[in-house]
Regions:
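Aromatic-lined glycan-binding groove of carbohydrate-active enzymes
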Residues: 213, 217-220, 251-253, 259-308
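Active-site gating/metal-coordination segments in enzymes
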Residues: 66-79, 83-87, 91, 95-245, ...
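Short polar catalytic/cofactor-binding loops
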Residues: 10-15
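Aromatic- and acidic-residue-enriched segments that line the glycan-binding/catalytic groove
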Residues: 19-33, 113-123, 167, 171, ...
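Mid-to-C-terminal alpha-helical segments outside catalytic/metal-binding sites
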Residues: 2-5, 16-71, 76-79, 84-99, ...
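Hydrophobic faces of well-ordered beta-strands that scaffold small-molecule active sites
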Residues: 7-9, 100-102, 154-157, 182-184, ...
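Structured helix-beta-strand junction loops
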Residues: 149, 178, 208-209, 257-261, ...
């Protein structure tokens, strides 16, 4: 049999924040300088907290200190792929990954101007004009970065929805620049909910151009205060605010009005989705709120049908139990993500993760989820895929194993890591990425090693 087509639909890219200056409109440079001063102070405090952290809720800072510390030379060289194309392609080759879909970054202090991580900023910036300008600066750089990859990287533009007609123009620009989707911030109080008609021009242009709309995991809202439990609660609810989008789109009739619109969940887990869709389906068929009319009387597309026709999800840091739930979603709607270069993803042990998570899935369905669905969904060049698969694709049988799948074990330590949510791969993968090479050696056949 032929080698596997391995495409990650969850990668991250972004310049070190200061280097965005050349991509930012000049009129915003003064505000940008102020932001850089604030971020420098934030980083200093963040790294100090990481050095001092014990087995406390600050354990997350301790891990992230190792990831972000300029003195950690080996890690810093590997994560340079967030903005260094040569390093990135080398890491992809080592994993046998032929293509990636790229979202904004922020873990390595490389957030885009005024935007933080997916539009949520550690230094509160409420000015819509600044946040949108920063997103456009990132999109300009991302288009250049992807264009230089020879078709291996597909970029997703960050779109801020404050001015809907500016957002429409930004989508058209992104498409013309070669980007292949958009990502929106989670719903918040600064703009209407996504089911409101004001967003119809945005959905229309995305459907017209085939630009998939994404909701990606990111920072939770800044509503948790300064209590010792605040960070744990924030991470515990990380995906909650993203889940609201699906209900808004489905019950708001967005997929009825825009039947060609495509929507993708990325890095918010998939194990919760089947039950959530079942709940939406129940509400659709019943007068759940005792209002005298069930939604099916005024909405022609059921949630299950909308999911099958319009939606997909990426399994990032996938676990065995999570992929079992993919059966209920439909294997044609599930894709895989490595999350390079983030510490909580599968990189640099993607083969081990896939072998475990997809252990009981038939090989045809496994091939769909780890690459073939993504190749079709994001319109990768078939000839490019064929040539790269022949060169670096994981050999047939690589992900077939007789070993019993390992379920992640949660513990108090995992809570203090700050990465507890509905999918348990995060705690395992953070240890993979941050432990010493002696503990978790690089076993990738394609990896280049020092002689």
């Amino acid at each position: 049999m032929k080698p596997y087509t391995l495409i990650s639909v969850d990668g991250h890219a972004g310049l070190p924040t200061a280097q965005y200056r050349d991509y930012l409109e000049r009129k915003h440079h003064a505000a940008f300088d102020e932001e850089l001063e604030q971020l420098a102070l934030l980083r200093k405090g963040f790294l100090t907290a990481g050095k001092n952290a014990k087995q406390t809720p600050l354990m997350y800072q301790a891990h992230m200190h190792r990831y972000s510390d300029p003195g950690n030379g080996e890690m810093q060289e590997r994560i340079r792929g967030a903005w260094d194309l040569d390093v990135r392609l080398r890491e992809l080759d080592a994993e046998g990954v032929i293509g990636e879909v790229l979202f904004p970054d922020g873990q390595g202090f490389n957030s885009f101007p005024f935007g933080g991580f997916f539009g949520e900023h550690p230094v509160p910036i409420r000015d819509p004009e600044l946040r949108a300008a920063g997103a456009r600066a990132h999109n300009r750089w991302l288009a250049e970065f992807c264009a230089a990859s020879g078709g291996r990287l597909q970029g997703v533009a960050m779109i801020m929805p404050f001015d809907i007609w500016q957002a429409v123009a930004d989508v058209r620009w992104a498409y013309a620049a070669g980007l292949r989707g958009i990502v929106l911030p989670p719903p918040d109080e600064t703009y209407p909910p996504y089911h409101e008609a004001v967003f119809d021009p945005l959905w229309a242009v995305c459907a017209e151009l085939g630009m998939a709309v994404h909701s990606h995991g990111g920072d939770p809202p800044k509503i948790y205060g300064q209590n010792i439990a605040s960070q744990t609660l924030a991470i515990l609810e990380l995906g909650f605010f993203r889940r609201r989008i699906l209900a808004q789109l489905m019950f708001g009739g967005v997929f009825v009005r825009h039947p060609n619109l495509r929507f993708v969940y990325t890095e918010v887990g998939i194990d919760w989705l089947p039950n959530f869709i079942e709940l939406l389906e129940h509400v659709y068929h019943n007068d759940w709120l005792r209002m005298g009319r069930a939604p099916k009387q005024w909405l022609s597309l059921s949630p299950k049908d909308a999911w099958a026709r319009n939606c997909a999800a990426a399994a990032t840091a996938a676990t065995f139990d999570e992929i079992q739930q993919a059966r209920r979603l439909g294997f044609d709607t599930v894709m895989w993500g490595a999350d390079y270069p983030h510490v909580e993803g599968g990189w640099p042990h993607s083969w081990d993760e896939i072998r475990q998570a997809f252990a009981t899935v038939g090989d045809d369905d496994r091939r769909k989820m780890v690459g073939e669905n993504a190749a079709r969904f994001y319109r990768f060049d078939p000839q490019l895929i064929e040539s790269l698969v022949a060169k670096i694709g994981p050999p047939a049988g690589t992900f077939v194993s007789d070993e019993a799948p390992q379920r992640p074990e949660f513990s108090v330590h995992d809570f203090t890591n700050g990465w507890v949510n509905t999918y348990g791969g995060f705690a395992r993968n953070m240890r993979w990425s941050l432990d010493s090479p002696d503990t978790h050696p690089d076993s990738r056949p394609n990896a280049k090693r020092d002689s």
